[in-house]
Curated annotation (Swiss-Prot):
HAMAP family: NAD_Glyc3P_dehydrog. Sn-glycerol 3-phosphate binds at residues 110, 141, 143, 196, 249, 259-261. It catalyses: sn-glycerol 3-phosphate + NAD(+) = dihydroxyacetone phosphate + NADH + H(+); sn-glycerol 3-phosphate + NADP(+) = dihydroxyacetone phosphate + NADPH + H(+). InterPro entries: 6-PGluconate_DH-like_C_sf, 6PGD_dom2, G3P_DH_NAD-dep, G3P_DH_NAD-dep_C, G3P_DH_NAD-dep_N, NAD(P)-bd_dom_sf. Keywords: Cytoplasm, Lipid biosynthesis, Lipid metabolism, NAD, NADP, Nucleotide-binding, Oxidoreductase, Phospholipid biosynthesis, Phospholipid metabolism. NADPH binds at residues 12-13, 110, 145, 260, 284, 286. This is Glycerol-3-phosphate dehydrogenase [NAD(P)+]. It is found in: Cytoplasm. It comes from Lactiplantibacillus plantarum (strain ATCC BAA-793 / NCIMB 8826 / WCFS1) (Lactobacillus plantarum).
């Protein structure tokens, strides 16, 4: 079942997913806005800024021209930063209006649109042609590009209101080291993906401050409770948060040095200021804008999210990171399950 697939976004995750699909026997075109990156991928088969010391398939072709990249595609996979997804979707829609294609639209980005607090499938649904909206598929779960690149075992979720679309995407990606489960709870899968980055910032900060495993386990457990509370209030299924796109993604993101959100939190905990952390990372730290969006959603929904609020205070109100933890610990005693 060879398909023509356009992958939009040549960062670490987008480029490695494109390489996986190419290795699975599909015809893959990888789009990047950077002509220099396209040249590197096509001539050297490398992407040193994002995935150092890795050789991409020689049959994988990169493009800087969006029209060429998506021409004839059966599937279009968005793997661009959250802040860019609406603009890129508008550009894709302009091309589709001329070509009259009806591809399946998939996204593997993790975040919430900061200005609107919308999930990314909602953003896509507002921009893509009407007839493509019902079959949007979300790819999410515990995954690091570096590990997929070396064929480590990885399991993630494909979620869609259209079960047949999710099953098609499942078959595109599955192989000996990459397994996908389907789910119909798009809301829960997307919120798990976005909100776990906030908790990963906190876990990294605890490490940078010198706290041990007890504190990190407590943070992840209570953080998952916050994610679930907000998610259910916004229409998610509770069980989704104990699945791959919930607790699975939280564990891998909040415990691994591969996680840019964990690394950013670690630097903040070690005493670096936020601007320096952002400047030195060189890649998007989705947990930062997601913290603001989640905090404001919690206020609107009247949902208690003390960990998220503490991280928001550090990021957006210049609160002292060493002081917010004792403040959390001194909160009024409560039942664990409410």
């Amino acid at each position: 079942m060879m398909k023509k697939i356009a992958v939009l976004g040549a960062g670490s995750w987008g480029s490695i997913l494109a390489n996986l699909l190419d290795e699975n026997g599909h015809s893959v075109r990888l789009w990047s806005y950077s002509p220099a990156q396209v040249t590197e991928l096509n001539e050297k088969h490398t992407n040193e800024r994002y995935v150092p010391d890795f050789k991409y398939s020689e049959t994988l072709t990169a493009y800087s021209n969006l029209t060429q990249a998506i021409d004839g595609a059966d599937v279009i996979l968005f793997v661009v930063p959250t802040k860019a997804i609406r603009e890129v979707a508008q550009q894709v829609t302009a091309v589709l209006a001329k070509t009259h294609q009806r591809p399946i639209i998939v996204h593997a980005s993790k975040g919430l649109e900061q200005e609107t607090h919308k999930r990314l499938s909602q953003v896509l649904a507002e921009e893509i042609p009407t007839e493509l909206r019902q079959a949007i598929v979300v790819l999410s779960g515990p995954s690091h590009a570096e590990e997929v690149a070396r064929h480590d075992i990885t399991l993630i979720t494909a979620a869609s209101a259209d079960e047949s679309a999710a099953e098609l995407v499942q078959q595109l990606f599955m192989n000996d080291y990459f397994r996908i489960y389907t789910n119909t709870d798009v809301v829960g899968v997307e919120l798990g993906a976005a909100l776990k980055n906030i908790i990963a910032l906190g876990a990294g900060a605890l490490h940078g401050l010198g706290y041990g495993d007890d504190a990190k386990a407590a943070l992840m457990t209570r953080g998952l409770a916050e994610i679930s509370r907000l998610g259910v209030a916004l229409g998610a299924e509770p069980l989704t948060f104990i699945g791959l796109s919930g607790v699975g993604d939280l564990i891998v993101t909040a415990t691994s040095v591969h996680s840019r959100n964990w690394r950013a939190g670690n630097e903040l905990g070690a005493g670096q200021d936020l601007k320096t952390v952002i400047d030195t990372m060189g890649m998007v730290i989705e947990g930062i804008p997601s913290t603001k969006a989640a905090y404001e959603l919690a206020q609107q929904q009247n949902i208690e999210m003390p960990i998220t609020e503490a991280i928001y205070d550090v990021l957006y109100k210049s609160a002292d990171i060493k002081e917010v933890i004792p403040q959390l610990m001194r909160r009024e005693g409560k039942p664990e399950i409410q």
